[in-house]
């Protein structure tokens, strides 16, 4: 069983190099839904809140999980919680390059844009989240958050290179 929805699909489609998948409206093979022995559903996203992993490495939802909840009808502005999400993996022969030019700051409910003059005050927020392996990420924009337990850059994966230019602040 797989879950797909408009927001979830958008996250995975923008993070694909497959032009055929990028043109699809909605696919239903983005996130696998599994069931434990007691028939409780969980997502096949390692080490996340909505998974059944033995080890949960962060006490809040990932962007993928927030998008699932949004697709199920919850009223969530994901931009409040996560600036940029990368859900993609390269190979050991070829790293996937990502240039992040969108910063993370306080998000305005009225203009629906980030406010570069105000840091985010949302607890447990993440400026940039990399969920995958073999990525090269150039964080070319600032991340400003003063929320309790906020993280500038969260990496769930291996063999990722994160490059932060000297003039970028996190």
Kindly label every feature range from the protein language model:
Residues 1-94:
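Extracellular zinc-dependent metalloprotease catalytic-domain scaffold
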Residues 26, 31, 49, 56, ...:
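Weak global preference for isoleucine
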Residues 60, 79-82, 138, 153, ...:
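Generic marker of "main functional regions" within proteins
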Residues 83, 88-90, 151, 157, ...:
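General "foldedness" signal
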Residues 93-124, 134-149, 159-170:
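Beta-strand-rich solenoid/repeat architectures in extracellular/passenger domains
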């Amino acid at each position: 069983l797989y879950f797909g929805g408009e927001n979830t699909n958008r996250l995975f489609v923008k993070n694909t190099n497959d032009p055929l998948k990028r043109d699809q409206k909605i696919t239903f093979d983005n996130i696998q839904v599994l069931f434990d022995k007691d028939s409780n559903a969980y997502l096949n996203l390692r080490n996340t809140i909505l998974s059944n992993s033995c080890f949960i490495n962060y006490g809040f939802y990932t962007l993928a999980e927030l998008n699932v909840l949004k697709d199920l009808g919850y009223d969530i502005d994901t931009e409040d919680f996560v600036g940029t999400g990368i859900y993609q993996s390269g190979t050991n022969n070829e790293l996937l390059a990502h240039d992040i030019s969108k910063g993370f700051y306080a998000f305005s409910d009225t203009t629906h844009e980030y406010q570069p003059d105000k840091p985010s005050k949302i607890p447990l927020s993440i400026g940039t989240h990399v969920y995958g392996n073999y990525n090269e990420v150039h964080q070319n924009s600032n991340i400003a958050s003063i929320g309790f337990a906020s993280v500038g850059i969260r990496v769930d994966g291996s063999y990722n290179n994160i490059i932060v230019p000297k003039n970028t602040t996190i």
